[in-house]
């Protein structure tokens, strides 16, 4: 799991010093308020550094509650989606859009091309269960089926596998 933490600085000063602390996500609100001396709902703090896979979603005035929500959404993604998160963002608008669609995305982690996906679908799809092993091995045209899938489906090919995306 990738490290998720932020450096938060108070807008107020205690004496001459501005207070800042690193917090691991999800942030415990009571600990946050105790360490910084400001309410989690206040505008008296800002995020000055971040180590997050979803860093583009977070800006200086993102609230603790929003940070925790982003962290929750990211952690709900399967490991393959987390690993390929930057590539998935080329298709999805943001983390929330990916999170909403996460259960309808099919991951083919061991597939390097569409023929591999065609083979995987043949093995796992109940539509093909009536085909004999001989038929599957000797007569099934995987290249044609792969072309059909690519033409009529939506797929994202990555370094670590292929994702079948919703239309």
Where would I find each of the regions flagged by the language model?
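N-terminal ordered "arm"
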Residues: 1-42
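A broad, low-specificity signal marking well-ordered, structured residues that form hydrophobic/aromatic
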Residues: 6, 21, 45, 156, ...
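Short, flexible beta-strand-to-coil junctions
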Residues: 9-15, 52, 159-160, 166-167
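A generic structural micro-environment signature
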Residues: 14, 29-33, 53, 146, ...
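Mixed-charge (acidic/basic) macromolecular-recognition segments
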Residues: 35-126
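Acidic, proline/glycine-rich low-complexity IDRs
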Residues: 119-167
């Amino acid at each position: 799991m990738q490290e998720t933490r932020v450096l938060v600085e108070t807008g107020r000063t205690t004496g001459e010093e501005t207070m800042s602390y690193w917090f691991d996500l999800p942030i415990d609100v009571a600990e946050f308020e105790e360490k910084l001396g400001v309410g989690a709902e206040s505008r008296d703090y800002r995020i000055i550094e971040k180590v997050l896979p979803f860093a583009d979603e977070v800006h200086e005035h993102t609230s603790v509650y929003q940070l925790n929500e982003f962290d929750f959404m990211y952690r709900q993604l399967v490991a393959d989606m987390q690993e390929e998160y930057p590539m998935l963002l080329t298709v999805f608008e943001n983390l929330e859009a990916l999170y909403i669609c996460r259960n309808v995305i099919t991951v083919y982690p061991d597939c390097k091309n569409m023929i591999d996906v065609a083979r995987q679908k043949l093995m796992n799809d109940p539509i093909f269960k009536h085909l004999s092993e001989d038929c599957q091995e000797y007569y099934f045209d995987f290249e044609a089926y792969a072309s059909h899938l690519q033409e009529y489906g939506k797929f994202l090919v990555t370094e670590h596998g292929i994702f079948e995306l919703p239309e």
